[in-house]
Amino acid sequence: KRLYAELREGDIIADLAAHEQHWPLIVAADVLCYFGALGDLLARVHQRLEPGGWFVFSVEKILPDHDGVVPGNGNWALQRQGRYVHAEHYVYDAVCTAGFRVLRIDRPVVRQEAGADVPGLLLVAERIRHDG
């Protein structure tokens, strides 16, 4: 269908570090759920975006258990299905710390699992700070 101008497969952090190209847009749908801490990935994405470039990505949202306890460290947790969930405050803070401005946050259902909705976050962030 020719949906992609370019599709890269491999370790995303290593791939971003190995290339010097800059892009106006990077999209990572259903990718960040395979990372706990997001700082290193966000820093590499920031380096590869043009000033004013956008990073659009989704994460699965962390939810308290039936006793109201947030799993993991309160910022992110590894679930038994092998994907990470993230707290909204953590994602927002990590994005801003990496030099982005959050333009939009939506809270969609990102998948169905075992017949249940999996809540998520969909963010649009703009690169605002220069590296260095």
Language-model segments: which ranges?
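Core SAM-dependent methyltransferase catalytic element
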Residues: 109-132
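Short alpha-helix
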Residues: 83-99, 105
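A conserved beta-strand element that flanks and buttresses the S-adenosyl-L-methionine
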Residues: 27
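Short, glycine-/aromatic-enriched active-site segment of Class I SAM-dependent methyltransferases
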Residues: 57-84
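Short conserved loop adjoining the S-adenosyl-L-methionine
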Residues: 14-20
